[in-house]
């Protein structure tokens, strides 16, 4: 196995206004989340979130501590949320064994020393997408399915934004230090998410898009309300959203995305909305 990581530094919104397409994609887009028998990570300076993916095929993959953590093991001072977006797989945390099927999630609290990822069937490998944030204490590990989620049905087909927001790793479902994660599924015929757009200066966010057909794409919108930019994305890619940035998208097909947040509070509703007509 191999662990790959890179560090992404934070940008001032006034500086980001001058970024060209190449720079925007370099600083915010995470193009390669999954590689066979590898663990890929981005260590972001936005609330020190780590965004990553593990795709075990022929090997069992270990969650290794990367140098920026300066810690004996990855979850020494961190918590983690994991979603399986591939074939059936297993996550082992110490002596605990968690079977994760498609679109099932797992919360791991601080203190888990030995964490591994494996696939049940190498022909249909699991894809474990994860977010990790600093944690001040340990909370119990817990598997969460859509049946456990707080579900909000939003939008309309006429508005091209009919979707179910599955709040899965949130404080209404289980205790966390600062991590919140969930999964939004757009209905056929709907392509817009998070519109009207909002920001939450108390928290950063990361989006991971999947269930995007190969011949289709997602246009992710970011930036300040009056200085928006776009990032064209494919399926199985992620994007970082600073606390000062909107995070929205439209696509050429319906899709699903996983959102993960961390920062000042655990209040999902702490959002500063903007009018659609104010976007520039």
Swiss-Prot record:
Any one GO MF term held by the record is: 4-deoxy-L-threo-5-hexosulose-uronate ketol-isomerase activity
The record's listing under CDD domains reads: cupin_KduI_C, cupin_KduI_N
Annotated GO biological process: D-galacturonate catabolic process; D-glucuronate catabolic process; pectin catabolic process
Coiled coil ranges = none
Keywords from the named record: Isomerase, Metal-binding, Zinc
Catalytic activity field: 5-dehydro-4-deoxy-D-glucuronate = 3-deoxy-D-glycero-2,5-hexodiulosonate
Q: Which amino acids does the record list as binding Zn(2+)? A: 198, 200, 205, 247
Enzyme Commission identifier(s): 5.3.1.17
Q: How is the cofactor bound?
A: Binds 1 zinc ion per subunit.
What pathway does the annotation place this protein in?
Glycan metabolism; pectin degradation; 2-dehydro-3-deoxy-D-gluconate from pectin: step 4/5
Pfam families per the UniProt record, alphabetical: KduI (PF04962)
Q: Which InterPro entries match?
A: KduI, KduI/IolB_isomerase, KduI_N, RmlC-like_jellyroll, RmlC_Cupin_sf
Q: Which family does it belong to?
A: Belongs to the KduI family.
Q: What does this protein do?
A: Catalyzes the isomerization of 5-dehydro-4-deoxy-D-glucuronate to 3-deoxy-D-glycero-2,5-hexodiulosonate.
Stated name of the protein? 4-deoxy-L-threo-5-hexosulose-uronate ketol-isomerase
Species = Bacteroides fragilis (strain ATCC 25285 / DSM 2151 / CCUG 4856 / JCM 11019 / LMG 10263 / NCTC 9343 / Onslow / VPI 2553 / EN-2)
């Amino acid at each position: 196995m191999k662990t790959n990581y890179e560090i992404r530094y934070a940008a001032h919104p006034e500086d980001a206004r001058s970024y060209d397409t190449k720079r925007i994609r370099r600083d915010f887009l995470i193009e390669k989340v999954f590689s066979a028998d590898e663990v890929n990570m981005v260590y972001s300076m936005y609330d020190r979130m780590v965004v990553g993916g593990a795709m075990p095929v022929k090997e069992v993959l270990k969650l290794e501590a990367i140098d920026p953590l300066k810690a004996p093991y990855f979850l020494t001072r961190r918590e983690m949320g994991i979603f399986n977006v591939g074939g059936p797989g297993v996550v082992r945390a110490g002596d605990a064994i968690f079977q994760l099927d498609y679109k099932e999630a797992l919360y791991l609290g601080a203190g888990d020393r030995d964490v591994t990822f494996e696939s049940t069937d190498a022909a249909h490998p699991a894809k474990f997408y994860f977010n990790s944030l600093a944690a001040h204490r340990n909370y119990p590990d817990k598997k969460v399915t859509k049946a456990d989620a707080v579900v909000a049905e939003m939008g309309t087909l006429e508005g091209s934004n009919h979707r179910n927001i599955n709040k899965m790793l949130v404080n209404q479902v289980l205790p966390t230090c600062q991590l919140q994660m969930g999964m939004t599924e757009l209905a056929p015929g709907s392509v817009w998410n998070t519109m009207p757009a909002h920001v939450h200066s108390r928290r950063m966010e990361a989006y991971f898009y999947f269930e995007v057909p190969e011949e289709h794409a997602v246009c992710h919108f970011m930036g300040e309300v009056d200085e928006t930019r776009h990032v064209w994305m494919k399926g199985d890619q992620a994007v970082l959203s600073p606390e000062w940035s909107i995070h929205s998208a439209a696509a050429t097909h319906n899709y699903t995305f996983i959102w993960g947040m961390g920062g000042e509070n655990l209040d999902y509703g702490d959002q500063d909305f903007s009018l659609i007509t104010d976007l520039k």
